[in-house]
């Protein structure tokens, strides 16, 4: 119990520190200090305040970017040969057995779609990512987990297709309709505290080349890391998708 409590306290301190560093004292006050009244638990109130503080910060600071994409519409896929993207940074030979099994299952059920395994050695062949982001990954300022969020948006923006996390096991042929949607993800009928509310899943995401969501998220990530050195929240990708769903009609239609 003591170890769990200490972990929770440390995580809470990290959350507040990151919000303070990126979004300032006002959002820390709203998130962690402002008193609350009513029947909701302190935990629920804190979670909701944290989510609202992060959304407010992002929507305020990236308002011009949001406006840029407000009227853009999704473009239907132009090819039935859309690629499939998966990443294992160290390469296939370094995959642990469970990841190898997942990768083989993906290749076996890809149909006519070419599976591209992105690694540290071949990434520059497929996608262009700013040097300042790659440098911050090397410096440890950007975790590899978050870098993979950036990577999937960049790949889908440049090439379109379907991103699947390396730890997803595919048990049957991927339906062609997945590749025919301008924006594809999966939803789950579950209760969750995540800002996504299980309306989308980042581990599987499909898009047309230069699709609205991936274009918006890619550009926001680029602008964010050009000036920041800390990740505002572990689930930043979900906050970005939430903002897109709220403000961009084409994304909202696809995720409804």
Placement of each model-derived feature along the sequence:
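Glycosyltransferase-associated regions of secretory-pathway enzymes
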Residues: 1-148, 166-256
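Small-residue hinge/turn detector
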Residues: 149-159
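Active-site acidic Asp-centered loop
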Residues: 159, 164-166
């Amino acid at each position: 119990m003591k170890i769990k409590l200490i972990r929770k306290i440390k995580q809470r301190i990290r959350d507040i520190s990151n919000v303070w560093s990126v979004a300032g004292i006002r959002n820390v006050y709203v998130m962690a200090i402002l008193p609350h009244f009513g029947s909701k638990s302190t935990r629920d109130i804190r979670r909701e305040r944290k989510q609202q503080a992060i959304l407010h910060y992002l929507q305020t600071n990236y308002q011009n970017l949001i406006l840029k994409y407000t009227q853009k519409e999704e473009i239907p896929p132009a090819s039935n040969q859309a690629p499939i993207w998966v990443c294992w940074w160290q390469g296939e030979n370094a995959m642990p057995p469970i990841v190898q099994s997942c990768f083989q299952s993906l290749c076996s059920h890809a149909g006519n779609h070419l599976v591209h395994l992105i690694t540290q050695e071949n990434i520059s062949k497929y996608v262009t990512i700013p040097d300042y982001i790659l440098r911050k990954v090397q410096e440890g300022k950007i975790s590899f987990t978050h870098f993979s969020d950036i990577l999937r948006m960049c790949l889908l923006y440049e090439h379109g297709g379907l991103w699947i996390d390396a730890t997803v096991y595919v048990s049957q042929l991927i339906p062609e309709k997945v590749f025919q949607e301008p924006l594809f993800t999966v939803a789950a009928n579950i209760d969750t505290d995540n800002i996504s509310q299980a309306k989308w899943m980042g581990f599987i995401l499909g898009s047309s080349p230069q699709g609205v969501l991936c274009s918006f998220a890619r550009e926001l990530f680029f602008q964010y890391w050009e000036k920041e050195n800390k990740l505002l929240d572990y689930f930043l990708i979900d906050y970005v998708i939430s903002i897109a769903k709220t403000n961009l009609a084409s994304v909202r239609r696809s995720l409804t």
